[in-house]
């Protein structure tokens, strides 16, 4: 009997350690659930958009709206203030009253409309790209028409020999002119010889010889 008594307390401690591991597993599994929720900035923008107050939503009203949505306002008070400041700096919210996180806030309608317009432009920009690509195909066909232009140019090459014949005729005509030039030179030489024959006519006053008779 004395041997069986100490064996019972030795089996008890491992049974106590098992529930501690289960608690740790629950804590580890619970952390991603908090991270899976939307960020504070999205919750703030939704709360401000849902309010119908013209003067803007105060910080107290924001906290009430966030608490109603299931957000822990007391633990995340600093996050709410940082989220408000970042949204104001980005331009999504406009601070109508107060300074910093304490005041009233409204949605910036210009920023909201500006964010919506580029999305429409992107969607519209993708559709016309296809017809532009289709228009490029006929350009390729027009490029295929270039051989036709080259075919038209070939008869011009055939016309070049005709131009060569014209040049030959032009070359022949100066030959005729060259033949005519020596004739003119001969005429000029004949004209030059005539005054030489006139010189002995001038010497006629030698008729004084009859005086000797």
Curated annotation (Swiss-Prot):
Residues covered by region (Disordered): 1-41, 92-213
CDD domains noted in UniProt: H15
SMART domains to which the protein is assigned, alphabetical: H15 (SM00526)
UniProt GO BP: chromosome condensation; facultative heterochromatin formation; negative regulation of DNA recombination; negative regulation of transcription by RNA polymerase II; nucleosome assembly
Coiled-coil residue windows: none
GO annotation, cellular component aspect: euchromatin; nucleosome; nucleus
Biased composition (Low complexity): 1-17
Keyword Acetylation tagged: yes
Phosphoserine modified-residue sites: 2, 104
Function: Histone H1 protein binds to linker DNA between nucleosomes forming the macromolecular structure known as the chromatin fiber. Histones H1 are necessary for the condensation of nucleosome chains into higher-order structured fibers. Also acts as a regulator of individual gene transcription through chromatin remodeling, nucleosome spacing and DNA methylation.
Domain notes: The C-terminal domain is required for high-affinity binding to chromatin.
Name listed for the protein in its UniProt record: Histone H1.2
């Amino acid at each position: 009997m004395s041997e069986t008594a100490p064996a019972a307390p030795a089996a008890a401690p491992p049974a106590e350690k098992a529930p501690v591991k289960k608690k740790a597993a629950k804590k580890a599994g619970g952390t991603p659930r908090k991270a899976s929720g939307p960020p504070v900035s999205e919750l703030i923008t939704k709360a401000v958009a849902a309010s119908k107050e013209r003067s803007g939503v105060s910080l107290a009203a924001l906290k009430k709206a966030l608490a109603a949505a299931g957000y822990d306002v007391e633990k995340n008070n600093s996050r709410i203030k940082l989220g408000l400041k970042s949204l104001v700096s980005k331009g999504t919210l406009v601070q109508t009253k107060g300074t910093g996180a304490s005041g009233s806030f409204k949605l910036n309608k210009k920023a909201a409309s500006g964010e919506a317009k580029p999305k429409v432009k992107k969607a519209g920009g993708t559709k016309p790209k296809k017809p532009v690509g289709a228009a490029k195909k006929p350009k390729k066909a027009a490029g295929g028409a270039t051989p036709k232009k080259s075919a038209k140019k070939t008869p011009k090459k055939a016309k070049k020999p005709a131009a060569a014949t014209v040049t030959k005729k032009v070359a022949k005509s100066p030959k005729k002119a060259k033949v005519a030039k020596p004739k003119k030179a001969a005429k000029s030489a004949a004209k030059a010889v005539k005054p030489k024959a006139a010189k002995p006519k001038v010497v006629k006053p030698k008729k004084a010889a009859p005086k000797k008779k």
